[in-house]
Amino acid sequence: HVMHLGAAMQMKPWLLAVIFDLPKPQTPFAQDNLLMTTSEDLSKNVVGIETPQEHFGVMDSFSLDEQMVMLRAVLKRTPEQKEKDFEKLMRAYLKGDAAEIANLDAQITGGMLPAPLWKKMRSKLLEERNVVMAQRSLMKANEQSTFVAVGASHLAGETGLIAAFRQAGFKLTPLNMR
């Protein structure tokens, strides 16, 4: 990744960790942007499940020391490691295997962070947010036909969105991703 030093110096360590943990993009457009623009092109109403403050504020709950641990861990990873891990995640995603994605999250991110920090990160980034995302998504889904797009890590587990929708009585059908 290439970034102007002045810009990097203005960013919080957690944001730098997120940016530098990504492999080289396959396309200039992120999946979120592709889904949003496609929906807008089809004149579909696009609504965020979280506010930007909720989305980004989660990381502000981590101390500066914790953010630096995250950044150092990410910077130790080689581009080859990032690409290999990304490919594993993509294979699990394309198979529709949410449990495997959760396992890979634990291996990859959990494997590079101290256990207490990984536990806090999982709780703050996934479990707590999943509850809110599920409540808001279910409200919409009970009102009208709804397409919900979230990061794949939000799908699996007891607090994942798949479990929440099934517990609410919805029948879920995976999309054919091939």
Locate each region found by the language model.
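Structured, acidic catalytic/metal-binding patches in enzyme active sites
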Residues: 1-121, 125
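C-terminal soluble interaction/assembly domains
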Residues: 119-178
